């Protein structure tokens, strides 16, 4: 089977329902927690580490759910949602490779926020660079990531870790 190298929103929502890669595969979260509208490129090689990369985008609109509650009178996208998007994309990479299991964020080394996403922004862009993939009894990916708003880097994270687990009862 030939792998796709880009995904639209409908395909990403199909992943949330278990329809894109099958019921046993990892799933993206559904709306409103799916934090990107499309994956513009995904490769199992490339990136600075040569281990793979994912590029994705989120269209910013003033009516996005988080602007109405974070904060009243001072709307800003919560930084943790951008970080979660980076974990979502790292886990999606493992699922796209064909690894089975449910995705779980396992941590990260360093996170920096140097800007914010406001309702008048137009586009958030994510760059995920895979630095390590383990596909044995433990299935895990490690990545370095950046988030841009309107082409300005505002978040960075190093050593993001996501695992896929076939059994999560004792996790």
UniProtKB/Swiss-Prot annotation:
GO biological process, one term: unsaturated fatty acid biosynthetic process
GO CC annotation terms, alphabetical: cytoplasm
GO MF annotations in UniProt: (3R)-hydroxyacyl-[acyl-carrier-protein] dehydratase activity; trans-2-decenoyl-acyl-carrier-protein isomerase activity
Localization of this protein: Cytoplasm
InterPro entries documented for this protein: FabA, FabA_FabZ, HotDog_dom_sf
Pfam families hit by this protein: FabA (PF07977)
Record-listed E.C. numbers: 4.2.1.59, 5.3.3.14
Record carries keyword Mitochondrion: no
Catalytic activity of the protein: a (3R)-hydroxyacyl-[ACP] = a (2E)-enoyl-[ACP] + H2O; (3R)-hydroxydecanoyl-[ACP] = (2E)-decenoyl-[ACP] + H2O; (2E)-decenoyl-[ACP] = (3Z)-decenoyl-[ACP]
Active site: 70
Job description of the protein: Necessary for the introduction of cis unsaturation into fatty acids. Catalyzes the dehydration of (3R)-3-hydroxydecanoyl-ACP to E-(2)-decenoyl-ACP and then its isomerization to Z-(3)-decenoyl-ACP. Can catalyze the dehydratase reaction for beta-hydroxyacyl-ACPs with saturated chain lengths up to 16:0, being most active on intermediate chain length.
Family per record: Belongs to the thioester dehydratase family. FabA subfamily.
Record protein name field: 3-hydroxydecanoyl-[acyl-carrier-protein] dehydratase
Gene name for this UniProt entry: fabA
